[in-house]
Amino acid sequence: MAPPPLRPENALKRADELISVNEKPAALQSLYEFITARRIRYATPSQVEPIVFKFLELGVELKKGKLIKDALYQYKKLVHGSAEGLVSVGAVLRKFIDYVETKLASEQAKAEEKQKEEVSDDLEGGVTPENLLSSVYEADHSVAGFNDEALNSWMRFSWESYRTALDLLRNNSQLEITYSGVVSRTMQFCLKHQRKNEFKRLAEMLRQHLDTANYHQSKFGSNQVDLSDADTLQRYLDQRFQLVDASVKLGLWHEAYKAAEDVYHLMKMTTRKPKSSTLANYFENLVQIFLVSGDQILHTLAWKKYFELYSTNPNATEEEFKKIASTIFLSALSIQLDDLPNVRYNYQSRSYRLLDVETKPTRKEVIQSIVEDDTIFSRVDAETKTLYEIMEVEFDGESFKGKFEAILPKLEGESYFANYSVSLRDVIIRRMFVFASQKYEDISLNDLYSSVTFSSSFKLSEWDIEKQLLQAAVDDYVSFQLDHEQNKVTFVKDPLVNFAAIKEEEVEEEEEEEEEEEEEEKEAEGAEGAEGDTEEGQEAVAEPEPVIKRNYYIRKRLSELYEKLLEDTDYNTVSYLDKVRIAREALIKHTKDTIEDMKKNSEERAKMHQERRRQHMESAAMNAEKDAEQRQKRIMEERASIEAKLEEEAHRRLIEKKKREFEEVKQREIRKLVDELNAKGNGTKVEYDEVKDMDIPDITKYFVNRLSKNKDELEERMNFAVKRMDHLERAYRKVELPLLKKQADELRATDEVNFGNMKKKIVDAAKAEYEAKMEDYNRVSSVFDDYKTLRDRMLAAHNEKFAAIRAENAAKLEAAKKARIEEVRKQRYEELLARSEAEKKAAEEAERRAKLDEIARKQREMEEALERKSAARTFTQPRAPVVPNANLDEIARKQREMEEAIERKLAGKSAAPAPAPAPAASTPAASTPAAPGKMSFAERMRLKRQQQQQK
């Protein structure tokens, strides 16, 4: 079925006509109906876009936010199925935001122009009781301060429009770029008009969109946002950078911190490093966030990160570097003292991850890292370095005040000093209190106050100084006794000295308590003997429950710690602050050991409990298995007994049923037999009631006895009936024969007629077929000669073609066979030649060895003969002179000559060239053996015998 026709130009024309007659609401409604109609799904989005643009323009002008929202949702629902439709949705929403921003700007310009025209002389904007009361009854609220309602309504409309656009664009991979653009424009709207509440809702909305996108990563769906894509992740990261920047500009520090956490998590996911300028701006915002939070360590670390990135800026000047370096160093000096160890939970531990710091660094570590970093410390101004020297390196409480007041005016002249003056003042005052506690045992209040009273912005009242002193005592940096009557402060040198006196008092109190307990026990025993076993006596002797107080436990532990620390010789020689540090470290170590012991004990208890539970479970499982077996056995026995009873009952019922069925069959047969006998009409009738208790044979016998009376008469009747039936049958057949013959003649005549008709039809059909075939034959016979000629020519051409192909294939086959035969012959010849050469070499080697053996044998014989001859001469002429070895030398010479001749002969044979390959069969060589493939049988046999002989 074809889609319904769509005429966008008609809808536009209709809307223009309604607008021309000042019926804009009706025009808006007509466009709304057209956009939300289902038939637009069959049209291309480019056809519908002009209608939507016109609708949005008119809707924004009339401020119909709900109608626009519904229309946009319906439009997206109808066209989002295709990529072109999603592109159209993005274009429509961008146009919508353009219309809204243009309209808001025009309305704001109108409001400003109107406010300029209505200038009042009243400095308070014309807000007086009189015109305030009169404005209630007037339609035009022109009083200054009350004429912004229209503009506020347009701002609310703009905010709702931004929300609608973001909701339509969220979590769609095809609309990511448009979504990012609308997010940026929404932030600019909140910044421009200082809409803090709307900005909070925007931040929450963006966070929900990101959570939803992350949640849908593992689910299947079309156009899902892929957070593993680098471009997508970068867009989300850029949005969070803008969110941090806008939050800081609006002063929404909580939102800025949340956005910074989002930036941290997104940067962990991405592999693409953001731009240095973007990161520098981000860390600059973190500097302000941590400054407001009051955490100076985080503030200083953020400054360092910012300086590292800002140092890569080619446009930065040395003056800016010096200012930033001085600010960083001053912020580090403003970090509150953290000389004492503590185990409090750090609520800012999550914030350190934002700066890629695993654990919280100490104040000393932060300052030392800046001092060691030459790129920062070398650019710090002289006054700040001097402050570092007098505060950290060479602190002297007596001379500090003069040195500090000398550089204070220059420091106050710097623009960055105001942010750190309060925290720096607290650090300096805390150090002065610690110095005073170490140097003096007691000091007058006036002297103490004057030592920490500075000029200008560092000046505090006595009340504030006393608060600082109390706070230092709370933080355990000093311990003192304040005497306002004598106007002096007495510093305590040992933080645990009071617990020694407490311990002595506690020992006395414990002895008194023990004596009181013994007296109470005696009184209780006497009361028990007097009252016997009565209930009142039992209540009287009931032991009171002990009350354990936490303060008592703490005092006891501290007194034990004090006794332990007194054994350390260094404890008595150090200052109060060092004693507190030592005590805290000892307490922390003891607590850690206690916790470790508790953990081990709890783990051991858990293991024991687990083991007991396992054993209990195993025993329970075994018992349960035994119980289950017994229960199963009992159930089987009960089931077997029940089945036996049921089987017995079923057998009994079956027997009864068979008996009933047999009785019913018997009675039915008796009734049937009685009916049959009575139906024969032999003159004898038997009643059912007479024979119902009899058996079948008895009934038959009974009936036969009843019939025996008329037996003779019955036999006579039967014989007569048989004879009568025989004559009747013969009469029937005699009459029937002529009729049957007549019927057969009629059937024969009918068959002959049908046969003639059928034969005629077959003959006619055969003749017609023959004539048709003869006609075809005569028609084809005229062209038969041509057909035969064409056939012969085609057969000849075909045979000639196939003969050529066959001859070619035969030639190829023959050539291949010859090549293969030649290859096999050559291979066999080479194998035979190699084998013959090897055998020949072996024979020559054997011959050479035999000759060498023979020469050696002859040499041995000659040597033996010479030895025998020499021995004989020695025996016959013992005193004759020794004969020269001339004969032996001659023999050796001859032997060497023979060996050299044999070696030359063998070398000549081995150096002879190998025989050439066998020549063609047409020219065989007479002196060389024929190739293996061309030898005769006799030649092959002769060669074989030669090889066997050589072996």
UniProtKB/Swiss-Prot annotation:
Residues 298-496 form the PCI domain. Residues 97-125, 496-532, 592-676, 704-779, 808-909 form a coiled coil. Gene3D superfamilies: 1.25.40.860, UVR domain (4.10.860.10). Residues 503-544, 863-951 are annotated as: Disordered. It comes from the Eukaryota. Pfam families: eIF3a_PCI_TPR-like (PF22591). GO terms for cellular component: cytoplasmic stress granule; eukaryotic 43S preinitiation complex; eukaryotic 48S preinitiation complex; eukaryotic translation initiation factor 3 complex, eIF3e; eukaryotic translation initiation factor 3 complex, eIF3m; incipient cellular bud site; multi-eIF complex. Residues 505-538 have a biased composition (Acidic residues). The keyword Metal-binding does not apply. Residues 919-932 have a biased composition (Low complexity). The keyword Magnesium does not apply. One of its GO terms (molecular function) is translation initiation factor activity. Keywords: Coiled coil, Cytoplasm, Initiation factor, Protein biosynthesis, RNA-binding. It is found in: Cytoplasm. RNA-binding component of the eukaryotic translation initiation factor 3 (eIF-3) complex, which is involved in protein synthesis of a specialized repertoire of mRNAs and, together with other initiation factors, stimulates binding of mRNA and methionyl-tRNAi to the 40S ribosome. The eIF-3 complex specifically targets and initiates translation of a subset of mRNAs involved in cell proliferation. PANTHER family: EUKARYOTIC TRANSLATION INITIATION FACTOR 3 SUBUNIT A (PTHR14005:SF0), EUKARYOTIC TRANSLATION INITIATION FACTOR 3, THETA SUBUNIT (PTHR14005). Belongs to the eIF-3 subunit A family. This is Eukaryotic translation initiation factor 3 subunit A.
